[in-house]
């Protein structure tokens, strides 16, 4: 099964979650990113920050980056697996868990 949405986390620390998320079926529309614990939304943002590295790799317009401010406690919950990061498609009809922490290659 292939998903239309792809997202990656590149950094998690005591203040920020940084990454990118992109809907291949709606390349000009930003997607929503959420940190969840069970069904509770603990933090959210829109992936619409401009990034030259995404543009150079041919990932849409390059405006698919995100940087989300989080608390130190939420950072620890993410590292312990007690909270997860999810991304929607551009229509917010489907949600996908981002399970990978990696750099864009």
Where are the regions that the model predicts?
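Basic, ligand-binding patches in group-transfer machinery
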Residues: 1-105
């Amino acid at each position: 099964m292939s998903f239309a949405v792809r997202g990656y986390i590149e950094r998690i620390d005591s203040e920020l979650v940084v990454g990118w998320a992109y809907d291949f079926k709606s390349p000009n529309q930003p997607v929503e990113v959420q940190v969840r614990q069970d069904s509770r939304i603990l933090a959210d943002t829109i992936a619409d920050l401009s990034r030259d590295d995404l543009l150079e790799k041919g990932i849409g317009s390059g405006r698919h980056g995100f940087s989300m401010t989080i608390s130190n406690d939420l950072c620890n919950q993410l590292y312990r697996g007690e909270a997860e990061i999810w991304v929607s498609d551009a229509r917010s009809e489907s949600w996908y868990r981002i399970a990978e922490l990696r750099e864009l290659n």
